[in-house]
Curated annotation (Swiss-Prot):
The gene is nhaC. Keywords: Antiport, Cell membrane, Ion transport, Membrane, Sodium, Sodium transport, Transmembrane, Transmembrane helix, Transport. GO terms for cellular component: plasma membrane. It holds the Pfam family Na_H_antiporter. This is Na(+)/H(+) antiporter NhaC. Its main location: membrane. It comes from Bacillus subtilis (strain 168). Belongs to the NhaC Na(+)/H(+) (TC 2.A.35) antiporter family. Is a secondary, electrogenic Na(+)/H(+) antiporter that catalyzes Na(+) uptake and proton efflux. Makes modest contributions to pH homeostasis in the alkaline range of pH but is not contributor to Na(+) resistance. Appears to have a repressive effect on growth and on alkaline phosphatases production in the presence of sodium, by affecting the transcription of the phoP/phoR two-component regulatory system.
C-alpha cells in the first residue's frame, strides 16, 4: 500500500459491501457466471482508487501482482484438466466408474462418497487430488444411478475437504500450524472439537438424503445399460488404475502437486500406448486438449466418459485471473488491512475474537478467492491479540482452518470453488446447500468460542 494513502474503516466497509452487492446480485438475480461481475468490481474499485488519489501505476501494479500470485493455481487447474482427459482416454476413470456401479447401491452412494473421499484426502492431504481422481468417478456413478449430482458433489467435497483440514500431509494444515507457531499434531487434536461434531451432523444428513434415493428395477436396468455403454465405448481395464495409484502414492510422499499431476499424465500416456488397442498419439493428444469424444448410444454413459481436457478448465482459469486481480488491487490500496484493523478495535472477549478470526478468514476468502491468504492475513493480524489476552494460539489456528480452508470451495471465484465446479461439472451455487461439513464447522467454532472458557 502507498504510505501516504490510507482508507478509513467505514470507507473500506462501504467499498467491500458494494462489491459484494454487485457480485451477488449478478449471480442470483441475473443468473450469470461470476467472471463479468468480478471484472466490474475490478473496474469499480480501480475508479474509486483513482478518485481517492491513488496513482494509476500503483493500481496497475496491484492488479498485475495479484495475477502473478495466481500463476501456480492456474498451472494446477490446467494440469488437472489435462489429467482428467488422459484418465478418460486411458480408461482409468471409466474403469473406476464401472467397478463402483457394479458394487455400490444408489442409496449408499452419498455415504460411500463421503467416507471414501475422507480416506483418500487424509492419505494424500489434498482435496484437489481427491476430487480429480475418485470424485470425478463418483459423479459418473451418481449420473448413472439417478442420484442428484449436487448431492453427490456435496458429499465428495465434504470428504475431500476433511483431509484438507485434518491430514498432517495437507499444505493448509501445516500452513495454519506454522502461522500459529504450534506443533502440527497439537493443532490437529484441537481441531477435533469442531470437526467431529460437524462430521457427525454431516453423516446423519447424508444418511437421510441417501435413504430418499430409490433403487427400483428401472434404476437397476439403467445402471446395467450405462455399464454396457461405457464398456462398449471406452477402455475398461484394471491396468489403467496404475496411473491414479501412482498419483496417490506420490501425494502421500509429499511430492509437490505439479510434478505429481505431470507424472499422472505421463504414466497415463504410457499405459494408453500399451493397453488401449484403439489408441493413437493424435487421438490421445486431442483428448488432453479437448477431452474425450467416445461414441455410444447411451446418453448417460456419454456424459460420464466424454469429459476433461485443457479447454474444460479455461473458464476456471480466466475466473481465477480476474479474482486474483481483484484481490491484488484490494491489498494494494489497503482495503483488506483497513477492514481488519477496524474489526480488531471492537474485540472485547474471547468469543468475539474467535468469531472475528473466522469471519475475517471468510472475508479474505470472499475478497481474494485465495485459501492461503485467508489463513495468512487474519493469522498474522490476530496473533498478537490472542497472546495479549492469554488465549492459546491453537484457538487461532483452528479458527483459521474453519474460516479459511473450508470456505474457499463455497466461493464461485475461489481457487477451490472454481476447480471443484469444473472437475465435477456441478456449479458452486448448486452444491453449496449440500456441503454441510464446510459451513457447519465454522458455526461450531464460533459457538465454542463463546461457550467454552
Amino acid at each position: 500500500m502507498d504510505s501516504q494513502k490510507k482508507l478509513t474503516f467505514p470507507l473500506a466497509v462501504g467499498l467491500f459491501i458494494f462489491m459484494l452487492c454487485i457480485i451477488i446480485s449478478c449471480l442470483f438475480l441475473l443468473h450469470v457466471e461470476p467472471h463479468i461481475p468480478l471484472f466490474l468490481s475490478v473496474v469499480m474499485l480501480s475508479a474509486a482508487a483513482l478518485w481517492f488519489g491513488f496513482p494509476w501505476k500503483s493500481i496497475e501494479k496491484g492488479i498485475v501482482d495479484g495475477i502473478k500470485n495466481g500463476v501456480q493455481p492456474i498451472i494446477v487447474l490446467a494440469l488437472i484438466g489435462i489429467l482428467i482427459g488422459a484418465w478418460m482416454y486411458s480408461g482409468a476413470i471409466p474403469t473406476m466408474t464401472v467397478y463402483a456401479l457394479s458394487f455400490i447401491e444408489p442409496s449408499h452412494l452419498l455415504l460411500t462418497a463421503l467416507f471414501s473421499c475422507m480416506i483418500i484426502s487424509t492419505l494424500v492431504g489434498s482435496s484437489l487430488t481427491t476430487v480429480s481422481t475418485i470424485g470425478v468417478a463418483l459423479i459418473g456413478v451418481a449420473s448413472a444411478a439417478g442420484v442428484p449430482l449436487e448431492w453427490t458433489a456435496g458429499a465428495v467435497i465434504c470428504g475431500a475437504c476433511f483431509g484438507d483440514k485434518m491430514s498432517p500431509m495437507s499444505d493448509t494444515t501445516n500452513f495454519a500450524a506454522g502461522i500459529g507457531e504450534i506443533p502440527i499434531f497439537e493443532h490437529i487434536r484441537h481441531m477435533m472439537g469442531t470437526t467431529i461434531p460437524a462430521l457427525l451432523i454431516t453423516v446423519v444428513l447424508f444418511y437421510f438424503l441417501g435413504s430418499s434415493v430409490s433403487a427400483d428395477a428401472a434404476s437397476t436396468d439403467n445402471i446395467q445399460q450405462v455399464i454396457t455403454g461405457i464398456k462398449d465405448a471406452a477402455n475398461v481395464t484394471p491396468w489403467a488404475l496404475l496411473s491414479p495409484l501412482l498419483v496417490v502414492l506420490l501425494a502421500m510422499k509429499r511430492v509437490s502437486v505439479i510434478p505429481v499431476l505431470t507424472a499422472g499424465i505421463i504414466s497415463s500416456g504410457i499405459l494408453t500406448a500399451i493397453f488401449v488397442p484403439y489408441s493413437s498419439l493424435q487421438a490421445f493428444m486431442t483428448a488432453l486438449q479437448n477431452g474425450t469424444t467416445f461414441e455410444t448410444d447411451n446418453e448417460a454413459a456419454a456424459k460420464i466418459i466424454n469429459r476433461g481436457g485443457l479447454q474444460s478448465m479455461m473458464g476456471s482459469v480466466s475466473l481465477i485471473m480476474i479474482a486474483f486481480a481483484l484481490g491484488g488491487l484490494m491489498e494494494k490500496i489497503g482495503l483488506i488491512s483497513a477492514l481488519l484493523e477496524g474489526v480488531m478495535k471492537g474485540i472485547r472477549s474471547k468469543g468475539r475474537l474467535v468469531a472475528a478470526t473466522v469471519c475475517s478468514s471468510i472475508g479474505v476468502n470472499l475478497a481474494t478467492g485465495e485459501q492461503y491468504l485467508s489463513i495468512l492475513i487474519p493469522g498474522q493480524s490476530f496473533k498478537s491479540l490472542y497472546d495479549k489476552r492469554n488465549i492459546q494460539r491453537k484457538f487461532l489456528t483452528r479458527s483459521l482452518e474453519d474460516g479459511g480452508t473450508l470456505i474457499n470451495p463455497l466461493i464461485p471465484w475461489g481457487v477451490s470453488g472454481a476447480f471443484m465446479a469444473s472437475a465435477l461439472g456441478v456449479p458452486v451455487i448448486d452444491y453449496i446447500p449440500f456441503t454441510f461439513f464446510l459451513y457447519i464447522s465454522p458455526m461450531i467454532s464460533i459457538l465454542i468460542g463463546f461457550v467454552k472458557k
